[in-house]
Amino acid sequence: MGKKAIQFGGGNIGRGFVAEFLHKAGYEVVFVDVMDKMVEALQQNKSYKVTEVSEEGEHTTTITNYRAINSKTHESDVIQEIATADVVTCAVGPHILKFIAPVIAKGIDARTESKPVAVIACENAIGATDTLHGFIKQHTSQDRVESLYDRAQFANSAIDRIVPQQAPNSGLDVRIEKFYEWAVEKTPFGSVGHPDIPAIHWVDNLEPYIERKLFTVNTSHATTAYFGHFRGKKMIADALEDEEIRGLVHKVLEETASLIVAKHDISEEEQKEYVKKIVSRISNPYLEDKVERVGRAPLRKLSRKERFIGPASQLAERGMKYDSLMDAVEMALRFQNVPGDDESAELANILNEQRAEDATIHLTGLDEEHPLYPAVLERVRKVQQGTK
């Protein structure tokens, strides 16, 4: 019997990143989703194309050997698929993990295979698999929790690939940048060994990869979007053509780089090269990436462990500089009432209805004693007062 992977989430990252590399590694991919149209499209089309875009041109891969199940209407089928799978991955958004955990827990519990299934969450969040693992344990009966690890192994991952907004008529096909990084911790697999997926870079310690990626790629991307939006830019590449915005992005990245170099075994030179590569990637006009797409979901992006407060709080704790990160936070706070983005409307409501102190705690998760709190509070007040 061939290798089988269950991929929760049939969106652009699920199809254009995770499934592409599972397919190339020889897995049959079973997509699981709750969106009727997505499941039907995957069921009705036996292939789709992933086009990698770079300055050198385009390269297209055809993805085949997949199926799709609607977990809303066919939960028992999903349970059976997980019971006989080699790998379970997901790309659903960190806030959806709690909703997919119950069916994954049932699928793991139904396993009789001697080899445990590998569970890898592919989300833009630190410790996403740990989070999913916690929810799965909550949905596993107490007498089965101890033997859970005979049936499943859980490994955190760091993913990095820019997926721009897709053309409205693209269907299942995905345009995506050529560059990617997919790092997964190998220690949880112990003597059993990790799955055979050549695209994955298996590492002993994932934290440096996750923080370097989140605090460089995601921080710079969002900083560009928020400054770009404030200055009326439509595309990320256009925003970075503006020398002032580019300079502001580099100042933010100097601060996050100082944290990465101080905290992890990464040299200044290596981080400088990484920053150069990242800014070049997000400047790529061929990606046709919109400012509003990159800036969407500001509440999540302003949260405690995310791309701004995450590094700024650690810099504050170390007594290091974080002024430029606060400029980026201010721009994120100004990303309000953007059409099609519910979080930007909710952000506007929070800032309109709550006192600055309450809004700061609500948005960032910082407590009043934290050394970063006063600096964020100052920016919240400034935005609430409507001063530029």
UniProtKB/Swiss-Prot annotation:
Catalytic reactions of this protein: D-mannitol 1-phosphate + NAD(+) = beta-D-fructose 6-phosphate + NADH + H(+)
Gene Ontology molecular-function annotations: mannitol-1-phosphate 5-dehydrogenase activity; NAD binding
Record: active site: 213
Binding-site residues for NAD(+), renumbered to this chain: 5-16
Pfam families in UniProt: Mannitol_dh, Mannitol_dh_C
GO (cellular component) term, any one: cytosol
Keyword entries, A-Z: NAD, Oxidoreductase
Transport recorded as keyword: no
Gene Ontology terms: biological process: mannitol catabolic process; mannitol metabolic process; response to heat; response to oxidative stress
The enzyme's E.C. designation: 1.1.1.17
Induction (record text): Strongly induced at the onset of sporulation.
Family to which the UniProt record says this protein belongs: Belongs to the mannitol dehydrogenase family.
Function comment: Catalyzes the NAD(H)-dependent interconversion of D-fructose 6-phosphate and D-mannitol 1-phosphate in the mannitol metabolic pathway. Has a strong preference for NADH over NADPH. Required for protection of conidiospores against exogenous stresses such as high temperatures and an oxidative environment.
The protein's assembly and partners: Monomer.
Protein name per the record: Mannitol-1-phosphate 5-dehydrogenase
